[in-house]
């Protein structure tokens, strides 16, 4: 096997510790924050990455005024690193015992739970079969309240995608949805089924319609996603949700020029980073590794 400069690569190996540090830096895009997360000094982390670059014979990072970004070889390595770490952890859990034990209370919005939780929980359970994950569903503002009360240990939440937040794990586009064949142009004002008034989908819908000069009325407001979807299925209102979570029997509405485009939202994790349990930290790292690939 030959490297980029023709050197023989048979004597080289991608060390697990180096790959773990690399993935964390790739996620937070800043050495200082990455060093705090992995429990090393910034100097030690820099030395680790220099060693990894020497092993792969490629530059992996480019420094910017705000931190670091991955080079093209770095982006390629990230895909391999996430897969290698996942398989390594699964093998260790299988061969060395039952993995972590205990209970974690995990908060997640309904639309994310529907789409993302099955694969996330399935893979985590294969690594830690004795761990129990209790699910608490609710909109982001309610989950943040639960975190403040320590009623949940870890929460997946939405936040505005302003392009400057390094904590975003995945981005999701907000879309208008309605019952197939139902035209928003036939309604004035436009009837809406929205989540709680302090949620991003509610705020985004009202702001967009206000800027477009489109009259609307909130026909139904609730933190229950099932209730919102039921109202849309009845043909009584239109709603806003992430594109990934749109049910197969409902339609994304994009043919009305008076129905303005909506922003994207970011997904991140919130928990007590100063004193997380081993189980909380492990589940958070699992989500960070797997969620971008779902």
UniProtKB/Swiss-Prot annotation:
Disulphide bridges: none
GO MF, any single term: DNA binding
Domain of life: Bacteria
Protein name as it appears in the record: HTH-type transcriptional regulator DgdR
Family stated for the protein in its record: Belongs to the LysR transcriptional regulatory family.
Keywords, comma-separated and alphabetical: DNA-binding, Repressor, Transcription, Transcription regulation
PROSITE patterns assigned: HTH_LYSR
HTH lysR-type domain location: 14-70
A Pfam family that the UniProt record links to this protein: HTH_1
InterPro entries: LTTR, LysR_subst-bd, Tscrpt_reg_HTH_LysR, WH-like_DNA-bd_sf, WH_DNA-bd_sf
Protein species of origin: Burkholderia cepacia (Pseudomonas cepacia)
Known DNA-binding region: 31-50
């Amino acid at each position: 096997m030959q490297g980029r400069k023709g050197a023989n690569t048979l004597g080289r190996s991608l060390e697990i510790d180096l790959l773990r540090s690399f993935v964390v830096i790739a996620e937070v895009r800043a050495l200082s924050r990455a060093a705090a997360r992995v429990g090393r000094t910034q100097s030690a982390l820099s030395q680790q990455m220099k060693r990894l670059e020497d092993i792969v014979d490629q530059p992996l990072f480019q420094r910017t005024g705000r931190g670091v970004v991955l080079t093209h070889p770095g982006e390629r390595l990230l895909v391999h690193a996430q897969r290698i770490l996942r398989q390594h952890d699964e093998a260790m859990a299988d061969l060395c015992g039952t993995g972590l034990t205990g209970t974690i209370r995990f908060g997640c919005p309904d639309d994310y739970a529907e789409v993302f939780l099955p694969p996330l929980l399935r893979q985590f359970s294969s690594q830690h079969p004795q761990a129990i994950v209790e699910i608490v569903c609710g909109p982001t503002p309610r989950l943040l309240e639960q975190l403040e009360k320590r009623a949940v240990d870890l929460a997946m939440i939405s936040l505005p995608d302003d392009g400057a937040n390094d904590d975003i794990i995945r981005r999701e586009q907000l879309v208008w949805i309605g019952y197939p064949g139902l035209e928003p142009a036939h309604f004035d004002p436009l009837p809406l089924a929205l989540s709680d008034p302090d949620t991003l989908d509610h705020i985004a819908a009202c702001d967009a319609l206000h800027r477009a000069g489109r009259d609307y009325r909130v026909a139904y407001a609730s933190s229950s996603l099932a209730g919102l979807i039921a109202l849309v299925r009845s043909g009584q209102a239109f709603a806003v949700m992430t594109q990934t979570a749109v049910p197969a029997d409902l339609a994304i509405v994009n043919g009305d020029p008076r129905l303005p485009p909506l922003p994207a939202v970011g997904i991140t994790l919130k928990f007590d980073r100063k004193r997380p349990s081993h189980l909380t930290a492990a589940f958070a790292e699992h989500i960070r590794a797997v969620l971008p690939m779902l």
